[in-house]
Structures are given as structure tokens and as C-alpha cells.
């Protein structure tokens, strides 16, 4: 009797493993139920295709901020914004190639040239402001930088009692 109860318990607890499932795409590899019966490579390709095919697009409806009916004045065609004129002039001028010669002695500097704040490129002997008569005002630039970094704080006057 003990053997019969032991036999019934073992039959209930023993589960036969499922046979491996081949990939749905018939690539020869085994698939998984977690990946829709596809192998890892086919599933990765499937996810790529589905995300590319249906990109998420959010359409925002335009709603006016105020419902007031104020008439708008049409722009005059004769007036052209100043920014547009400057853009046209900048587009007409071709960009200058970077200078690879010293502005003082015209010596070729190549990649070893020093850029100055005045806008020029100089060799190792003319890189200092005294050597090339620099037009940039370093003192004023320093004062402006300090003034910008340390704003003036004015305290309120104290009322005497």
C-alpha cells in the first residue's frame, strides 16, 4: 500500500518538460513563449521593424490663448526687418579661410599659431600684446568681467526713529 501511495504522489509531482519550440520564422533556432515563439535574433528584428513602422506622433491641437477679437494690422510690404537685410549681406560675403601666417612678420605658423583677442594669428615671437601692438583693451575687458561677476548691491536707507 505504501508503494501505491508513493507511486500516486510521484505521478502528480513529476511534470514532463515541454519539447523545445522551433522559431516561428523557421530560422533553425529555438523560440520562447516570452518572445512570441521566436528566437532572440528574429524577435530583435521584429521589435525593430514594429518600432520603425509605427513611430509615436503626438498632434497638438492649436487653441488660441485669448478669445478677444482684436483686429491685427497687416504688415507693410515696403518695410523689411533689419535682421533680414544683415542676413542677406552675410550670405553674399564668402567666409574667409583661417589665416596661417603671422600678421606682423608674415611667417607661416600653421597649427602652432597663437590666436589673439584682437582677432589676429601670430607666431611665437609676436604673440604678446607688446610685440604686435594689440588693439584689444585688456584692462577694460577685465573691468567689465569683474563688474559682470560682482553686481553692485545698494542697501536701502535706514530710517531713524
UniProtKB/Swiss-Prot annotation:
Binding-site list for Zn(2+) 1: 23, 27, 39, 42
Keyword Metal-binding: yes
Zinc-finger ranges (A20-type): 17-51
SUPFAM superfamilies: AN1-like Zinc finger (SSF118310), Glucocorticoid receptor-like (DNA-binding domain) (SSF57716)
Molecular-function GO terms, alphabetical: DNA binding; zinc ion binding
Pfam name, any one: zf-A20
Zinc finger region(s), AN1-type: 96-142
Residues annotated as binding Zn(2+) 3: 116, 118, 132, 134
Annotated region (Disordered), positions in chain: 62-99
Induction: By cold, dehydration and salt stress.
Keywords: Metal-binding, Stress response, Zinc, Zinc-finger
InterPro entries assigned to the protein according to its UniProt record, in alphabetical order: AN1-like_Znf (IPR035896), AN1_A20_ZnFinger (IPR050652), Znf_A20 (IPR002653), Znf_AN1 (IPR000058)
Residues reported in the UniProt entry to bind Zn(2+) 2: 102, 105, 123, 126
Bias kind Basic and acidic residues: ranges: 75-90
Role this protein plays: May be involved in environmental stress response.
Official protein name in the record: Zinc finger A20 and AN1 domain-containing stress-associated protein 9
Gene (name only): SAP9
Amino acid at each position: 500500500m505504501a508503494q501505491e501511495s508513493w507511486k500516486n504522489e510521484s505521478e502528480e509531482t513529476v511534470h514532463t518538460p515541454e519539447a523545445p519550440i522551433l522559431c516561428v520564422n523557421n530560422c533553425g533556432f529555438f523560440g520562447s513563449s516570452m518572445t512570441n515563439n521566436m528566437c532572440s535574433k528574429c524577435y530583435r528584428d521584429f521589435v525593430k521593424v514594429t518600432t520603425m513602422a509605427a513611430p509615436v506622433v503626438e498632434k497638438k491641437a492649436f487653441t488660441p490663448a485669448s478669445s478677444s477679437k482684436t483686429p491685427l494690422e497687416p504688415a507693410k510690404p515696403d518695410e523689411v526687418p533689419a535682421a533680414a537685410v544683415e542676413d542677406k549681406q552675410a550670405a553674399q560675403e564668402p567666409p574667409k579661410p583661417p589665416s596661417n601666417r603671422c600678421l606682423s612678420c608674415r611667417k607661416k605658423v600653421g597649427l602652432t599659431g597663437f590666436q589673439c583677442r584682437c582677432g589676429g594669428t601670430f607666431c611665437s615671437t609676436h604673440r604678446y600684446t607688446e610685440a604686435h601692438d594689440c588693439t584689444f583693451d585688456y584692462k577694460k575687458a577685465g573691468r567689465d568681467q569683474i563688474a559682470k561677476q560682482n553686481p553692485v548691491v545698494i542697501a536701502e536707507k535706514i530710517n531713524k526713529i
